[in-house]
Swiss-Prot record:
Biased composition (Low complexity): 1-16, 161-186
Designated name of the protein: E3 ubiquitin-protein ligase wwp-1
An MF annotation (GO) of this entry: ubiquitin conjugating enzyme activity
UniProt source species: Caenorhabditis elegans
Polar residues bias locations: 17-27
Catalytic residues (UniProt): C762 (glycyl thioester intermediate)
Length: 794
């Protein structure tokens, strides 16, 4: 389609100084000089002013930082791109060293209010602007002076003027289509009614030269409808046919197929979806239905993935089992009382809990390699000596597995500490402390959060140990476990939803959950946290999984473990990097002006917390910086959530004591609560990038060979080690998220062959040293995963 050229006879608006208008009716921004004179506010701070224009995409302009003052003076000139209709935003920010800069107050100013009566020029007077906090309270003032001559805007036909003074009775031409005065909207600032356009010429005139409708063009109101403004300037709509009003703009578009509009006894409009037999107050649109379908599809996919989670992998030795078949003369059986798997050796007529393919019992009859010797400690524990390297180890060199004494349950002590053994002990505690009969919980699918709250909180907490009998209203039937599993999924999806303001995501790209310090906006939040504590305890006691999990530091709190600096990496990488810099450098050589205080923002209000008594007067030095780091880390995970955490633990302990969980570490607790899923190694390998390695490097080949040899439990532990969570995203490994957004798993060559591997969970990165053999790689990786915190251990 040929482009339409503007008419050469197009008139220019008054006061435009002869500058031709653009076809879309907007003015080309020109430079305006803003002199920031001074400011005054109620609290001394290191502050600066940031200026932006809504008609410019340039970076914000900033003044210099003024130190520790309540009345900073700048007298600095800043140039911004703006026209007469621009809105200039001013932000007074407090400079921070470790955290993001905090906004103390802000203000907005329309240039049209300054140039309206001055023929487009500024009066060069001082403008006193009030600075408002996020709660709209005044915190101070800012004095500024404007100079320059902003470009004036030429009005196109059909585009509504922004001020009453810009209204004109002259007809104008755009794209060769003339508009009459009756087709234009009135330009008065306030009016009780606003008539809908009655001519198609107005719509045509509102089009730009490219054929795009003008900004702000609205759909024509249906017959019998009228738009009005209330006393606060808010739009509402009057239906003269039914003599009713509504805040929602009526549409001339027909309802989607299967929908019907009805009115309740009070005359309110609602909509019936005959497809799903549901109702809603909101008028359905094609976009809304499409978004709902996408949400439903995503939820169904998440539900499907959740149903595939498991806690312990079933040892069904299929043909494609990476461990291969059992040795000749061996058989796997199941204990009918505990359902625990054991192995029978028909050759010597013995039984054992260990899988002979992984525990090395076949290799124990083979001779030791040259230069090796086996000895025993005074307690009878075997160990091995390598006379060539003059080292000792508890690992049998023939199998690579530890050999140790028998524990209290007849298996090796190393095996006693395995995840399976811990689960068996925990399940024994739950079984021996269960209560006879069942407890019935009846809820509605449409109100599962509140219904479950009423059911759980009105029952005696000990009764929640009974066998669960879940029933959804209108869905009569027997619950043999499937309904309970669905209830745990649906309810966990609701109670952990950040929309309720009880929990919040750990970061922009970290969807693990932590308690929201601002949860007090809900007056009953402590009761809800007690309810959630009971619910989480029920999930663990009855062996059910929840939809989403918490941060690792929260699991450590549940286990009463000390939170350390490394734990902050997953939650806030910026603070972690800052504290690591302080830890690794001599801060006495640079004037950082750090004190034992922490500033933070809560619901728009800036607060200061003393890390120790008199912290505002205690400077951080090289001598006391470790104490500062320790106190800051502890404060970071406890700020504003002490009462919520206490309520959560109160609810949890009312079902069963947290001491029962002391068998597990924080990673195992996450597996116990959220379950694990089959890890697709092929998908993982396809979505991996390499640094200083190539996909064909022998270390990379060994790594994937080792991953394929692992069972699902150990793969989940490896996934926790490198990404911080045992769960694979719904879209697979291609959807892995890092601290800065989507970030694929990465293997990087770092260190020497005697180093342990390191993980960076914020970046989904594994630092893999250049090991010389497959056995060395397996030994180092296994040690790093099982015996370390996962970062920085060498």
């Amino acid at each position: 389609m040929a482009r339409n050229e503007p008419s050469s006879q197009q008139p220019s608006s008054s006061g435009s100084n002869g500058t031709p208008a653009q076809q879309n009716g907007s003015a080309k921004p020109s430079k305006v000089t803003v002199k920031v004179v001074n400011a005054s506010f109620t609290k001394a701070a290191d502050c600066y002013v940031e200026i932006t224009s809504d008609t410019s995409s340039a970076a914000p302009k900033k003044t210099t930082v003024k130190k520790k003052t309540m009345a900073p003076e700048w007298n600095e000139h800043l140039n911004v791109h703006a026209n007469e209709s621009s809105t200039i935003s001013f932000r007074l920010l407090q400079k921070a060293k470790l955290f993001d800069d905090t906004c103390l107050g802000m203000a907005k100013l329309k240039l049209s209010s300054l140039t309206r009566n001055e023929n487009g020029e500024f009066k060069n007077d001082i403008n006193n602007i009030s600075l408002l906090a996020k709660d709209s309270s005044k915190i101070g003032t800012l004095n500024i002076i404007f100079s320059g001559y902003p470009e004036r805007k030429r009005r196109s036909a059909g585009v509504r003027a922004e001020t009453a003074a810009s209204a004109s009775s002259e007809a104008s031409t755009s794209n060769g289509v003339a508009t009459s005065s009756s087709a234009r909207r009135p330009a008065t600032a306030k009016r009780d009614t606003l008539a809908a356009p009655t001519s198609t010429a107005a719509a045509a005139a509102a089009a730009t030269a490219g054929g795009t409708p003008a900004a702000g063009a609205e759909e024509q109101l249906p017959d019998g409808w009228e738009m009005r403004f209330d006393q606060y300037g808010r739009k509402y709509y009057v239906d003269h046919t039914t003599k009713s009003t509504t805040w929602e703009r009526p549409s001339t578009q027909p309802l989607p197929q299967g929908w019907e509009m009805r009115r309740d006894p009070r005359g309110r409009v609602y909509y019936v979806d005959h497809n799903t037999r549901t109702t809603t107050w909101q008028r359905p649109t094609a976009d809304m239905l499409e978004a709902h379908e996408q949400w439903q599809s995503g939820r169904d996919q998440a539900m499907l993935q959740w149903e595939q989670r498991f806690l312990l992998q079933q040892n069904n030795f299929s043909a494609d089992d990476p461990l291969g078949p059992l040795p000749e003369g061996w058989e796997k059986r199941q204990d009918p009382n505990t359902s625990r798997m054991y192995f029978v050796n028909h050759v010597n007529r013995t039984t054992q809990w260990e899988d002979p393919r992984t525990q090395g019992f076949r290799g124990s009859d083979q001779p030791l390699p040259d230069g090796w010797e086996m000895r025993f400690t005074e307690q009878g524990v075997p160990f091995f000596i390598d006379h060539q390297s003059k080292t000792t180890t508890y690992n049998d060199p023939r199998t690579g597995k530890p050999v140790g004494p028998l524990g209290v349950v007849g298996v090796q002590m190393a095996m006693e500490k395995s995840f399976r053994w811990k689960i068996a002990q925990f399940r024994y505690l739950c079984l021996s402390n269960s209560v006879p009969n069942h407890v019935k919980i009846t809820v509605s699918r449409n109100n599962v959060f509140e219904d479950s709250f009423q059911e759980i909180m009105r029952k005696n907490a000990v009764d929640l140990r009974r066998r669960l009998y879940i029933q959804f209203r209108g869905e009569e039937g027997l619950d043999y476990g499937g309904v309970a599993r669905e209830w745990f999924f649906l309810l966990s999806h609701e109670v952990l939803n950040p929309m309720y303001c009880l929990f919040m995501y750990a970061g922009n790209n970290n969807y693990s959950l932590q308690i929201n310090p601002a949860s007090f906006v809900n007056p009953d939040h402590l009761k809800y946290f007690e309810y959630i504590g009971r619910f989480i305890a029920m999930a663990l006691f009855h062996g059910k999984f929840i939809y989403s999990g918490f941060t690792m530091p929260f699991y450590k709190k549940m286990l009463n473990k000390k939170i350390v600096l490394k734990d902050i990496e997953q939650v806030d990488s910026e603070i972690y990097n800052s504290l690591m810099w302080i830890k690794d450098n001599n801060i006495d050589e640079c004037d950082m002006e750090l004190y034992f205080v922490a500033d933070y923002e809560l619901l728009g209000e800036l607060k200061t917390y003393e890390l120790k008594e008199g912290g505002t007067e205690i400077a951080v030095t090289e001598e006391n910086k470790l104490e500062y780091i320790e106190l800051l880390v502890e404060w970071r995970f406890n700020r504003g959530v002490e009462q919520q955490t206490k309520a959560f633990f109160t609810g949890f302990n009312s079902v069963f004591p947290l001491e029962w969980m002391q068998y597990f570490d924080e990673r195992e607790l996450e597996l116990l609560l959220c379950g694990m899923q089959d890890v697709d190694v092929d998908d993982w390998q396809r979505n991996t990038v390499y640094r200083h390695y190539a996909p064909q490097s022998k270390q990379v080949t060994w790594f994937w060979q080792w991953v394929r040899s692992l069972d699902q439990e150990k793969r989940a532990r490896l996934l926790q080690f490198v990404t911080g969570t045992c769960r694979v995203p719904v879209g697979g490994f291609s959807e892995l998220m890092g601290s800065t957004g989507p970030q694929l798993f990465c293997i990087e060559r770092v260190g020497k062959e005697n180093w342990l591997p390191r993980s960076h969970t914020c970046f989904n990165r594994l630092d893999l040293p250049p090991y010389r053999s497959y056995d060395q790689l397996v030994e180092k990786l296994s040690m790093a995963i099982e015996m370390t915190e996962g970062f920085g251990n060498e």
